[in-house]
Amino acid sequence: MIAQKSVRDYIRTIPDFPHDGILFRDVTTLFQDPRGFRLAVDQLLSPFVGETIDAVAGLEARGFILGGAVAHQLSKGFVSVRKKGKLPAATIEQAYKLEYGEAVVEIHDDAVQPGDKVLIVDDLLATGGTAEAGIKLIERLGAEVIGCAFVIDLPDLGGRAKVEAMGVPVHAICAYDGL
């Protein structure tokens, strides 16, 4: 009997990228394999089965790939949370802190409606800054974030605690300690 692969088995680890001492978790190998990709989408959704979800929001950039697949599976709309200046219509924006400085993400000001229930999807939860900004944007439009789903959690960087402190449940398929 052939053992079933886990999502973790499809993720490649690249040492010293983008800097010395970093172990980069590369999910592109997960996306390249149809079995791995399907497994990841199914597992991202599993804790939210039975929940009302009106839209799926993906965080730039790999969250677009995963979030789009999740939205398709649910037959729901997809919302892009993008870096500032990339969306063509009227937007709202939210700044968040980086290690050195600040970044800004935005969504269209009509991306969700008041009362909508939104699931946020991304590949990786590290410090939680981008997820926090995405949650704030969606809530500013009057919608509710019912959860955040990630392929990978890096718990040592504190992102889960930051998102959960906002009252938003976090689901991650796998976790990696350290950097």
UniProtKB/Swiss-Prot annotation:
Its main location: cytoplasm. Its EC number is 2.4.2.7. It holds the Pfam family Pribosyltran. Coiled coil: none annotated. The keyword Chloroplast does not apply. Pathway: Purine metabolism; AMP biosynthesis via salvage pathway; AMP from adenine: step 1/1. It is found in: Cytoplasm. One of its GO terms (molecular function) is adenine binding. Keywords: Cytoplasm, Glycosyltransferase, Purine salvage, Transferase. InterPro entries: Ade_phspho_trans, PRibTrfase_dom, PRTase-like, UPRTase/APRTase. It comes from the Bacteria. Belongs to the purine/pyrimidine phosphoribosyltransferase family. HAMAP family: Aden_phosphoribosyltr. Homodimer. This is Adenine phosphoribosyltransferase. The gene is apt.
